[in-house]
Amino acid sequence: MAPAASACAGAPGSHPATTIFVCLFLIIYCPDRASAIQVTVPDPYHVVILFQPVTLHCTYQMSNTLTAPIVIWKYKSFCRDRVADAFSPASVDNQLNAQLAAGNPGYNPYVECQDSVRTVRVVATKQGNAVTLGDYYQGRRITITGNADLTFEQTAWGDSGVYYCSVVSAQDLDGNNEAYAELIVLGRTSEAPELLPGFRAGPLEDWLFVVVVCLASLLFFLLLGICWCQCCPHTCCCYVRCPCCPDKCCCPEALYAAGKAATSGVPSIYAPSIYTHLSPAKTPPPPPAMIPMRPPYGYPGDFDRTSSVGGHSSQVPLLREVDGSVSSEVRSGYRIQANQQDDSMRVLYYMEKELANFDPSRPGPPNGRVERAMSEVTSLHEDDWRSRPSRAPALTPIRDEEWNRHSPRSPRTWEQEPLQEQPRGGWGSGRPRARSVDALDDINRPGSTESGRSSPPSSGRRGRAYAPPRSRSRDDLYDPDDPRDLPHSRDPHYYDDLRSRDPRADPRSRQRSHDPRDAGFRSRDPQYDGRLLEEALKKKGAGERRRVYREEEEEEEEGHYPPAPPPYSETDSQASRERRMKKNLALSRESLVV
């Protein structure tokens, strides 16, 4: 248009109509040498929720459409924080920005500042159909769509800022080739709290909230208690049965009932108790105690060899169990029907087993099976002292008056002692002292090793092979009818080791006190005092007795066979045999009571 204008101005003298026609022709058909470009952003302000998609639109106009321009999107941070200013509108900075905007209507304090004081990054570049992302946005789902639209498929923290759209063309150098759009990314806040995904709770009344909290607390403590009982059944204090596992009780109910029955005397409903107290009206007399004895030599196996009472002195047949299942049935006590392999029940099993055998001294129900039952805690059928690992220290033997005056090897007899030096009268005053009750039995056999010497050949007695069998009970300790019990056949060195009971506490002594046969014998020697025997028994130690027992047992096991039964004697009358049988039977019953 510049040449046309100069041509119209350079013809002042021509016809005016011709001049106007030429000017219009030049204006219409003569183009300019360069055209301008225009870039615009329809929506310069965007607010989007985090992780939501957004598109920043950008359009441009240019005169040359033969070549495609280069579209560049740049990111520049805000000069001031819009979110902070929105929450504090009365701040000094906000008031200053308001004054600047009022004085300059086109001024924007959040966008207009130098690039050196803010962050500048290239987001994406497009030339033709090729889109290239900047280094900071590699891997993000960002692209340029249409002519120059920037699209975010998912926004992120830090995307808030100012995005500039620039269009560069080599042929269109004039015009406005840049425009910007503001983007603010906010976090999502819901109007009502979400308890569950997709579920929104509306306004809740105060009283309803309190009820819900109380019910939740009660349910929590209930579940906690049930779980505690299931994990620790031996320490729980709640006697309830869990519905999740009814076969396994969460408390030792059977053990609790059994212990209560054992202490209060009420019979248990789980198992018959042998330790509960009986009512006074139904209390039976105490049954005779069983004394397991050692079998005599050469007799059947109805005797228990491993059981002993009082140093193997009394021997009586054992009352054996008729049914083996009875013993196990009684010993089982209070049984909890549970798996013994379960770790949580092992302690319970041990406790109820100990409770079942808690106090064997209490009498049980008056039946033969329970009376014959033995406790697993303490029993007369335990191993004897020879098999125990620990032994009591032996006490020093105490000598008597006779021991101090005479040597143990002295052959002096009791008839040679003056009467004033002998003890005062009492039962068995004419008998020498022995080391044990078994030694008293050996005194009756002059040929035995316990007597210390053999009987004289003039006495006409039988030797060891023809001696009667040794008695292991206290029934045959002394027989006044036997001539072997005369004082001249005893050795005085056994006087120091006599072991017996107090004649006043022994029921057999009371029985003998009424026996006219013993009265005649005691009258012959009234100088013996039975209290001296009791005093000697209290002073004797266990070591000497055990040594004598062990030596005697080793000697018998090594080279001696059981003696033969005594031969039949024509001199023994029928009355004498019957009298001895009655006496042995009565004393055997007394030994059972003892």
From Swiss-Prot:
Residues in the Cytoplasmic compartment per record: 228-594
Ig-like V-type domain ranges (all copies): 89-181
Phosphoserine modified-residue sites: 308, 314, 332, 375, 379, 407, 410, 436, 471, 473, 576, 588, 591
GO biological process, alphabetically ordered: epithelial structure maintenance; establishment of blood-brain barrier; establishment of skin barrier; lipoprotein transport; liver development; protein localization to tricellular tight junction; regulation of lipid metabolic process; tricellular tight junction assembly
Topology in the lipid bilayer: Single-pass type I membrane protein
Region called Disordered, residue ranges: 375-594
Family: Belongs to the immunoglobulin superfamily. LISCH7 family.
Transmembrane segment boundaries: 207-227
Entry keywords, A to Z: Cell junction, Cell membrane, Chylomicron, Disulfide bond, Immunoglobulin domain, Isopeptide bond, LDL, Membrane, Phosphoprotein, Receptor, Signal, Tight junction, Transmembrane, Transmembrane helix, Ubl conjugation, VLDL
Modifications after synthesis and translation: Phosphorylation at Ser-308 by MAPK8/JNK1 and MAPK9/JNK2 may be required for exclusive localization at tricellular tight junstions. Polyubiquitinated at Lys-583 via 'Lys-63'-linked ubiquitin chains; deubiquitinated by USP53.
Annotated signal peptide: 1-35
Post-translational modification Phosphotyrosine, affected residues: 478
UniProt source species: Mus musculus
Location(s), subcellular: Cell membrane; Cell junction, Tight junction
Effect of disrupting the coding gene: Death between 12.5 dpc and 15.5 dpc probably due to impaired liver and embryonic development.
Protein name as catalogued: Lipolysis-stimulated lipoprotein receptor
Pfam families, per database record: LSR (PF05624)
Subunit structure, interactors included: Homotrimer or homotetramer. Assembles into cell-cell contacts. Interacts (via the cytoplasmic domain) with MARVELD2 (via C-terminal cytoplasmic domain); the interaction is required to recruit MARVELD2 to tricellular contacts. Interacts with OCLN.
